[in-house]
A protein has these predicted regions:
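Extracellular and organelle-lumenal recognition/adhesion modules and their flexible linkers in secreted
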Residues: 1-168
Length: 168
């Protein structure tokens, strides 16, 4: 999506997504300095959920989601090969398999207001904010699809087959 600002990545949006369409993005590191991912600005209060479907690309690459606030930004780091939350701060984090190697990665119930929503990949698991310290070797990549911001009190997305839509 062109609304997302790129940082040290190239984005190719023609890969098979969890819903079977060719709308997933491949985020590939350019090797440039700085956070390796994409971000968009949102002014939100606390209590939000950030979700993104992610899939492992290069071996040993971790996916991450962060809501940037300037102080103790809520974030979560996900191992996309072992389906585990490696690290999180100021949120409830979870990872759920949805098929074909894809995972629904969630950063929920944030305790701080946020001004940016970021998604990316890294070679390490961090000891602080991924946005401030992520680094991904040039050419390594992850797949991402369906990033969105939700109110935490609304619960998860529910499939309604009677509508004819196909949601994961």
């Amino acid at each position: 999506n062109s609304a997302w600002t790129k940082s040290a990545v190239t984005v190719d949006a023609s890969y098979v997504a969890p819903d079977g369409t060719s709308t997933a993005s491949k985020l590939t590191s350019t090797g440039a300095a700085g956070a390796t991912g994409v971000y968009d600005s949102y002014n939100t209060g606390a209590g939000k959920s950030l979700t993104c479907f992610m899939k492992a690309g290069s071996s040993g690459v971790y996916g991450w989601i962060e809501g940037i606030v300037g102080g103790a930004s809520p974030y979560a780091v996900f191992d996309l090969e072992s389906a585990t939350v490696v690290r999180s701060r100021s949120c409830d984090a979870s990872i759920e398999p949805v098929g074909n190697g894809w995972f629904r990665c969630v950063l929920a119930n944030t305790t701080n207001a946020m001004s940016f929503f970021s998604v990316g990949g890294s070679d390490n698991t961090y000891t602080s904010s991924p946005w401030g310290s992520s680094d991904l070797t040039q050419g390594k990549f992850i797949y991402a699809w369906g990033a969105q911001l939700n109110r935490s009190d609304l619960g998860g997305m529910v499939n309604n087959p009677d509508r004819g839509d196909s949601y994961v």
